[in-house]
């Protein structure tokens, strides 16, 4: 009997221990990522506030990266920027198997529409949501399964054609809704997109004669997050007057939707008689909005002047940097960030790892400018805005810098990394993705949270005031072209904003002209493109681009076109060749005038 009792006790103890071990193992697999790993000695090359450290989760991904999401067990999901380089797959799954914070498993998955603007990647209510340029999809996630094997459901459907600003960012409220951004296929609502001097369509004072892009674009639509195959007509237009939005998030603390919108481009290129290069580099502000139902941001009629802190009428609608029109009646930004910083993600911090200063505040990923020349390109940072009661409670801060790795940034292609996506890990770490290599960082706080204060922010505040990619440039001293060899006046006025000072484009929207087959192998075609413009999609050096190239024949003379094409063909490692005014004239006569003369 005693032996039986001893056996029973021993067996029971083994079962208890084994059960506890299994529970611990199950728990530890899900939570071992919650134990903050060691940071890289150089913080992955980043500058951070005192007490913060960083490590590189993955150095590069073949498909590059747009937005990212982190599951509750630490698995990372990446929206691939380039499906072709990713084996045709649109998503990438990452897992750390040993708790050192570094990726050990990289698995591409999910085949769907493969254009490069598609942005979203979010984990919500047990599903993985992601987007292409036209669609929003989701897949059911299963516990401990890295790559979902569930079917891809289509949640929201947009219709072709493809055009600029189609990114489909998403956000979720606490009532079962998904919010989807619908960018406008236009820069400033012009009759001829991005063409110098072309007027805007519509009357800002007459809703019945409004810009046609406002009917089904340039806004945010709300849908049922759990219903499939919804078209735009099945949703509710929640907000309008937003040209291009990539950064979108719902703040559970204030129970509100927020966005940081991209301002318009090309004041100098389109209106060279109204804007100096410095004014064009400084305007307009990138607007941080709280978005309530019925919101109107004012595009395309108005822009926000970040120096005067007021909305002004766009020149396409009779603006002259002074006229305000009805701008004061429109939604005003919480903050006007510096022009062309390119806000590409927004995240309200809900974790407990960071000091109290960051609780419920907003992190913003600024991808970086393309059109600030002749001044340094700017942005390329992670910013932070402290919040209280749904409103900013202090000035915006530089949270992370050092992504570009060069100073100053003359052309966008000089930047080694461009921050793109933000995600919060289960332990409160902040994850940052970037587009050029697909690199991902994990930022952690290792200091004394109670001691965190102004002193720990001092070095980053100094960067805000002095770094060339962040500070307000001096109009004379910071002009990077003042000491450079003479360039083409036509190129610096009309071409440099898109194709850049080095001719390499921006790697995403605007194609390179350096060593380009469009420049080197068919002179007649090249002249025709300058005269009449070109609409995408087009392939340049193996990559697809979908931005409009405006025709220049209506405002440039034969001599000016010959001069700029000779300059382009004689630079940027192209095949040198002279283009004459007579050759331009001959091509002009071959083309019906209405194709390029819109005046």
Residue spans of the language-model regions?
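Beta-propeller domain segments
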Residues: 32-50, 63, 137, 184-233, ...
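Residue-level detector of Asp-centered blade-edge/turn motifs that repeat once per structural unit
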Residues: 71-73, 123-125, 172-175, 249-254, ...
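The canonical Cys-X-X-Cys-His
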Residues: 422, 440, 487, 491-501, ...
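Conserved beta-propeller blade signature
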Residues: 75-79, 127-130, 177-181, 256-260, ...
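Sequence/structural segment immediately N-terminal to covalent heme-attachment motifs in c-type
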Residues: 481-506, 521-532
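Hydrophobic core register within WD40 beta-propeller blades
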Residues: 68, 119-121, 170, 245-248, ...
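Flexible coil segments in periplasmic/lumen-exposed cytochrome c-class electron-transfer proteins
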Residues: 33-35, 304, 377, 450-482, ...
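Asp-box/WD-like beta-propeller blade repeats and closely related beta-sheet repeat scaffolds
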Residues: 105-112, 116-124, 133-173, 203, ...
